[in-house]
Amino acid sequence: MASTTEDLAVWAKALYEGRAFPAKLMPQALTGVSAPMLGKEARYGLGVIIRPTPLGTAYGHSGFFPGYLTEMVYFPDHKIALALQVNSSVPRSIGRPPVGFLVELAQIILEGDRR
């Protein structure tokens, strides 16, 4: 399967807003267990990384394929989804976890909306 960052962001929004599957399944997917290997205070639900951010709770998933890193994240308090793909399969090759870039980008977008 080939996908673009735009496809992933659209998918994340549909998925985490309950439009991809019956909405009654979402509480099961979003009830996570502690997953410290994914970040401080992170939890892992059914295929969902649940983590606190400065923008509130974020839902998402990351992945890699040799030569690529991918991250998608959805901020339910703001109803925005973002995705990032990087040409590297070394997790720290970009200096920090990819989700950090997405949180920062979301903050910039939201600040622009307030102006």
Regions found by a protein language model. Give the residues of each.
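Catalytic loop of the DD-peptidase/beta-lactamase superfamily, centered on the K-T-G motif
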Residues: 1-115
